A protein has these predicted regions:
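Alpha-helical transmembrane segments and their immediate juxtamembrane cytosolic regions
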Residues: 1-360
Length: 360
């Protein structure tokens, strides 16, 4: 997930965008932290009623919206250079993490199991295909899990890369919104014509790009302060989110399930993301100490996304050895992953900074 930094291009005071003294967008980091927290809760198997139900309404769209808010192409930067930067940011973690997990389970299951010749080709295919399954949820035929080495959350990285690729291509075109709408129509038609899920979420990328565009539009409107300065707008976002989310039903974007309507869920995801951002902006003013914790987590959503399932395996095993109950085990999995992987993320940043040569 892209770091919550924003270049002020409108000659406005940074506080009008919700920037703190370090140039961070704390409410944006809060939104990403809330999104990754719901990811952890869902993947740990937590069932918290309305919390996980409504959390499931925004926890993936909010990352697309946040990425759209921070989207920019530097003046004079070529499309190829832009794509290369996004590939380094998203595809290197994707293939690096996937390769690590594949090697780990190949050694664990095959080498130590006495069958080193078994190269887990199905797992390699899943890594290249980058979808949890080939057919939409509910498909009655054979539909095996493709990303089966605890790498299932990583589908998001390839999808976001293609969203950047598509939006970067159309962003400078005068008929950008026509192309955006046309792409959305293709996604919707594909969804209702065939249950086939294409590699790298190709059939869904134009759909996800609408969430991305909603993030950029929020920036054009003046940022989250536009919603918090007029309380009626913030309340309207919340009410639309709660009502439309109730009507939408459960979703699972990784499996191509959008609830009762793809278009309805677009509104749910956008209003839900805006609502979480408003809450973050309010907390920033009223509970700065709490926001500092969320900011720490929100800046490290990439390592948490990539490795939490792997860490879950060890935490769950350890909890079983200690005889912990189901509820306490899930708590250990969620909290332990947040603490350990946030620390890992900052440790990795520190090492990289030490490697960089000092500027003269």
């Amino acid at each position: 997930m892209k770091k919550g930094c924003l270049e002020n291009t409108n000659n406005a005071h940074p506080k009008n965008f919700g920037l703190n003294s370090s140039g961070r967008l704390e409410w944006l980091d809060f939104g990403k932290a809330m999104g990754i927290l719901v990811v952890l809760l869902v993947h740990a198997g937590c069932r918290l009623g309305l919390v996980t139900y409504y959390g499931g309404m925004f926890y993936m769209p909010i990352f697309f919206v946040a990425a759209g808010y921070t989207f920019r192409v530097k003046k004079g930067e070529s499309y190829g250079t832009f794509l290369l930067k996004k590939a380094k940011r998203l595809l290197i973690p994707y293939f690096g993490t996937s390769a690590f997990l594949w090697v780990f389970f190949w050694v664990k299951d095959c080498v130590l199991g006495g069958t080193p010749g078994d190269l887990k080709l199905a797992s390699l295919f899943g890594i290249l295909y980058s979808r949890n399954q080939m057919w939409r949820g509910g498909y009655t035929g054979s539909n095996p899990v493709l990303m089966n080495v605890l790498n299932s959350p990583l589908w998001f990285l390839t999808a976001l890369f293609l969203v950047y690729a598509w939006y970067g291509l159309i962003s400078k075109v005068k008929k950008k919104y026509w192309l955006l709408g046309g792409g959305l129509a293709v996604s919707v038609i594909w969804h209702y014509v065939t249950p086939l899920l294409l590699p790298w979420s190709l059939e869904a990328v134009p759909y996800f790009t609408v969430f991305f565009a909603a993030g950029e539009k929020l920036k054009e409107w003046g940022g989250v302060k536009t919603l918090t300065n007029d309380i009626r707008l913030g309340i309207a976002c919340l009410n639309f989110f709660l009502l439309l989310g109730f009507l939408s039903g459960s979703v699972n974007l990784s499996c191509g399930n959008y609830g009762v309507s793809m278009l309805l869920y677009l509104a749910v995801g956008i209003f839900g993301s805006y609502t979480i951002f408003v809450i973050g902006d309010r907390l920033e003013a009223r509970c700065p100490k709490i926001m500092q914790v969320f900011e720490l987590i929100g800046r490290q959503t990439l390592p948490i996304l990539c490795l939490h399932m792997f860490l879950y395996m060890f935490l769950q095993t350890g909890a079983g050895v200690l005889g912990l109950g189901d509820g306490l085990t899930k708590t250990v999995m969620v909290v332990g992953s947040l603490v350990v992987l946030t620390a890992v993320g900052y440790g990795w940043e520190y090492v990289n900074k030490r490697k960089r040569p000092l500027r003269p």
